[in-house]
Every structure is written in C-alpha cells, then in structure tokens.
C-alpha cells in the first residue's frame, strides 16, 4: 500500500521541512518491510481567488485530480476525530491488509477543505481542538505516519 499526502501550500526550506523529511525517510525505510510502498507528497499551490468559497472550490478540484482510484481518503480537519496513534495505526494496518492500494491524507489550505472532500473521506482526523498552521500539521502527520509503521512493526519508538 502506498501512503500519499496531498497538501495545499509548500513548505519552504527550514526546520519544518527538514523534520518532515526526516520522518518521511524513516517511514520509507521501515515501511518497505511492512508492505508499504513509500510516502508520496504532492504540494499544491494555494488558490489566489479573492473569496474563500472560490479558493476552497479551486483547491478541492486540484486535490481531487490527484486522488488515485480505489484509494481511501483521510481528511485532516478540525471537525475530524481526535484519534489516538494506536487506533490510527490499526486502521492503516487494516486498509493495508485489505489490499487498499493507497491511503491518501489531505491537508487543506488556510480556508479548509470543501464539504464534498470531507464527505468523500473514509476518515476525518483532527490533531486536537486547536487550529494548526499547515506547516505544523504536515510535520505532525508525517510523524504519525512514521509512528504507525513503528507500532505495526512492534518497534519501541511508540511507548503508550
């Protein structure tokens, strides 16, 4: 199974990008041993439209164009579930074991995700009740994806 992250906005060079890449590399190394084919990242430019509804719509169209067929969609959204790491790992492991070709995680732009994308999602995930900048969300997501691999592998990184 491939893990895909589609993010509106680009991380500039700096500590957030370096940390995200470190978790991505760690996942790729460990994930291959667990039946994962890597972590793909697609960065999309933020819409330049004047109003929020148009920005959300344009970004949703760009996101939808990148979602592979037969994949499961996971939206990072403040209205999503506060899911613990072990439960997220178990869900990703189930999808892998069921032969799902890809789990696609989506990080929206400043205005959030379209209602259509949220409805289409198999799972909505929130990293707590706070609103986070997309740079931080990306680092948190990559860490949780790496943590998923460590949990599935029985690696001591995750100590609950």
Swiss-Prot record:
Subcellular location: Cytoplasm
Domain of life: Bacteria
Gene Ontology CC entries for this record: cytoplasm
Pfam families found in the cross-reference section: SPOUT_MTase
UniProt GO MF annotations: rRNA (pseudouridine-N3-)-methyltransferase activity
This protein's record includes keyword Ribonucleoprotein: no
Main location per the UniProt record: cytoplasm
Assigned protein family: Belongs to the RNA methyltransferase RlmH family.
Subunit structure: Homodimer.
Protein name as it appears in the record: Ribosomal RNA large subunit methyltransferase H
Taxonomic lineage of the native organism: Bacteria, Pseudomonadati, Pseudomonadota, Alphaproteobacteria, Hyphomicrobiales
Encoding gene per record: rlmH
């Amino acid at each position: 199974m491939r893990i895909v992250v589609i993010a509106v906005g680009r991380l500039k060079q700096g500590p957030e990008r370096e940390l995200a890449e470190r978790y991505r590399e760690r996942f790729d190394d460990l994930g291959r041993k667990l039946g994962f084919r890597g972590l793909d990242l697609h960065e999309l430019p933020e819409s330049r439209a004047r109003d929020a509804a148009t920005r959300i719509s344009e970004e949703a169209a760009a996101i939808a164009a990148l979602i592979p067929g037969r994949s499961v969609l996971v939206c990072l959204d403040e209205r999503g579930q506060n899911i613990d790491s072990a439960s997220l790992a178990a869900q990703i492991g189930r999808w892998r074991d069921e032969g799902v070709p890809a789990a696609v995680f989506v990080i929206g732009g400043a205005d959030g995700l379209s209602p259509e994308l949220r409805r289409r999602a198999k799972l909505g995930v929130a990293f707590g009740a706070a609103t986070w900048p997309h740079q931080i969300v990306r680092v948190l997501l990559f860490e949780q994806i790496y943590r998923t691999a460590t949990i599935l592998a029985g690696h001591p990184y995750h100590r609950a």
